[in-house]
UniProtKB/Swiss-Prot annotation:
PANTHER family: PSEUDOURIDYLATE SYNTHASE, TRNA PSEUDOURIDINE SYNTHASE-LIKE 1. Belongs to the tRNA pseudouridine synthase TruA family. This is tRNA pseudouridine synthase A. Coiled coil: none annotated. Formation of pseudouridine at positions 38, 39 and 40 in the anticodon stem and loop of transfer RNAs. The keyword Ribosomal protein does not apply. One of its GO terms (molecular function) is tRNA pseudouridine(38-40) synthase activity. The active site is at D51 (nucleophile). Keywords: Isomerase, tRNA processing. GO terms for biological process: tRNA pseudouridine synthesis. It comes from the Bacteria. It catalyses: uridine(38/39/40) in tRNA = pseudouridine(38/39/40) in tRNA.
Length: 261
């Protein structure tokens, strides 16, 4: 039997999604709680592995099990055994052909910037603080140069293990709500650090340090060293994963909760 779950988590206290030796991860905590409910070892597969300090409101996982439990066990029961920073949002029995990673057709991330002279006292782990005068309209205009399929070598981490640097960006928008600026980007898949590297370069344009066409130049040059520094992890959220309609995967509000959809 294959089970899919929707997972929300605050990644600030974890080494990232992926299970690792001697350090705590979201995956390790989730598998521990699931194994307690199933009374057998459970291993999960996720839609997208997030880095240390990165959050998720729309992470999707699947696992296989031989035991039958009511939906309440996989939600309320698992949540009772999880730390407060991780929560199951929904559960669905799925066909064995469903795969959380390989069945996905798109992923969507949101990066939230707190643009204010002074650092925040609340939500400090869920925002990235930048105090300069940021022009979000310039950032949005520049971001449109990312649309379509490109070689994103300039925006991939040096240690990225992906065989191909090509990715297809479907949508990208930069909006402001008061002191909050949100970069919202959807693509078929993302390279390691791709979103944070894109945000770092868009910020340079928004701050007036680079021209509007800089993104196109960076795409063309295919050199990570030419782009801006990687943006901080704490403002980044995996908010949605898209699957073919045949799987009927539940859809919730994108989040994060303090931002309007």
């Amino acid at each position: 039997m294959r089970v899919a779950l929707g997972i929300e988590y605050d990644g600030s206290s974890y080494c990232g999604w992926q299970r690792q030796v001697e350090v705590d991860s979201v995956q390790a905590q989730l598998e521990k709680a699931l194994s307690l409910i199933a009374n057998e070892p459970i291993e999960v597969v996720c839609a997208g592995r997030t880095d240390a300090g990165v959050h998720g409101t729309g992470q999707v996982v699947h696992f296989d099990t031989t035991v039958i439990r009511p939906d309440s066990a996989w939600t309320l029961g698992v949540n009772a055994n999880l730390p407060d920073t991780i929560a199951v949002r929904w559960v669905k029995l799925v066909d064995d052909s469903f795969h959380a990673r390989f069945s996905a057709t798109a992923r969507r991330y949101r990066y939230v910037i707190y643009n204010h002279k002074f650092r925040p006292g609340l939500l400090r782990h869920g925002l990235s603080h930048y105090h300069g005068d940021i022009d979000e309209t310039l950032m949005h205009q520049a971001a449109q140069q990312l649309l379509g399929e490109h070689d994103f070598t300039s925006f991939r981490a040096m240690q990225c293990q992906s065989k191909s640097p090509f990715r297809s960006v479907h949508e990208v928008n930069v909006t402001r709500q008061g002191m909050y600026i949100m970069v919202d980007i959807k693509a078929n898949a993302f390279l390691h650090h791709m979103v944070r590297n894109i945000v770092g370069s868009l910020l340079e344009i928004g701050l007036g340090n680079q021209p509007l066409n800089w993104i196109s130049k960076l795409i063309a040059v295919k050199d990570r060293r030419q782009a801006a520094a990687t943006a901080k992890p704490n403002g980044l959220y995996l908010v949605d994963v898209t699957y073919p309609e045949e799987f009927a995967i539940p859809k919730l509000a994108l989040g994060p909760l303090f931002m309007l959809d």
